[in-house]
Design a protein with these regions (language model features):
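Short, well-ordered loop/turn sites that connect or cap secondary structure elements
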Residues: 40-41, 60
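Short, structured beta-strand/loop micro-motifs enriched in basic residues and often containing a Trp
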Residues: 43-51
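Ferredoxin-like alpha/beta domains used as RNA- or RNAP-binding modules
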Residues: 1-27, 47, 55-77
Length: 77
């Protein structure tokens, strides 16, 4: 049984050791643009590791799981 409820996350590789939440949403194709990321984050629709996250600049690292709607993506290096 998975420790994170919800959909199985897709691994999304990043180039650096960390990435900002807004950038990752776009990279993982969870949103179309950075402009679209801002309101969904502000509205509390995004979860990081199961917790609501409202900071677009939140730094994510390998292993973090981001969910939006029915989709999930895991930060991978």
């Amino acid at each position: 049984m998975s420790s994170t409820p919800g959909p199985d996350p897709v691994d999304v590789p990043i180039r650096d050791e960390s990435i900002r939440l807004g950038q990752f949403l776009k990279l993982a194709n969870l949103v179309e643009s950075g402009a679209e990321a801002k309101p969904v984050i502000a509205d509390g629709a995004v979860r990081v590791n199961g917790e609501v996250e409202t900071r677009r600049g939140r730094q994510l690292a390998a292993g973090d799981v981001v969910t939006l709607g029915g989709l999930a993506a895991r930060v991978a290096t």
